[in-house]
UniProtKB/Swiss-Prot annotation:
It comes from Caldicellulosiruptor saccharolyticus (strain ATCC 43494 / DSM 8903 / Tp8T 6331). Disulfide bonds: none annotated. One of the primary rRNA binding proteins, it binds specifically to the 5'-end of 16S ribosomal RNA. Keywords: Ribonucleoprotein, Ribosomal protein, RNA-binding, rRNA-binding. This is Small ribosomal subunit protein uS17. GO terms for biological process: translation. The lineage of its organism: Bacteria, Bacillati, Bacillota, Bacillota incertae sedis, Caldicellulosiruptorales.
Length: 86
C-alpha cells in the first residue's frame, strides 16, 4: 500500500521576530468579512516557522509551508524568501 501525502498549506507573511535559533515568527494577514456588518477586516495570525540556516531577518517577506510538528508550537517551515527587508 502506497500512502499519498495531501496538499500542504502555504502562506505568505512578514517576519516579525528572528530572536530564536533556527526559528522565526511570521505574521500572516488575512481579510475576513464581519458576519453582521459585512465590513472587511484585516486579521493577523502569527506562526512560528523553521528557518534552518538562520537566513531570515525582521521585515523579510517569506513563503511558509505546513510541515510535521517540529516542536510544541512549530508546525511551519520557511520555503523561500520572497523579498528582503529594506
Amino acid at each position: 500500500m502506497e500512502q499519498k501525502r495531501g496538499m500542504r498549506k502555504t502562506r505568505i507573511g512578514v517576519v516579525v521576530s528572528d530572536k530564536m535559533d533556527k526559528t522565526v515568527v511570521v505574521a500572516v494577514e488575512t481579510l475576513v468579512q464581519h458576519p453582521l456588518y459585512k465590513k472587511t477586516i484585516k486579521r493577523t495570525t502569527k506562526f512560528k516557522a523553521h528557518d534552518e540556516n538562520n537566513e531570515c531577518r525582521v521585515g523579510d517577506k517569506v513563503l511558509i509551508m505546513e510541515t510535521r510538528p517540529l516542536s510544541k508550537e512549530k508546525r511551519w517551515r520557511v520555503v523561500q524568501i520572497l523579498e528582503r527587508a529594506k
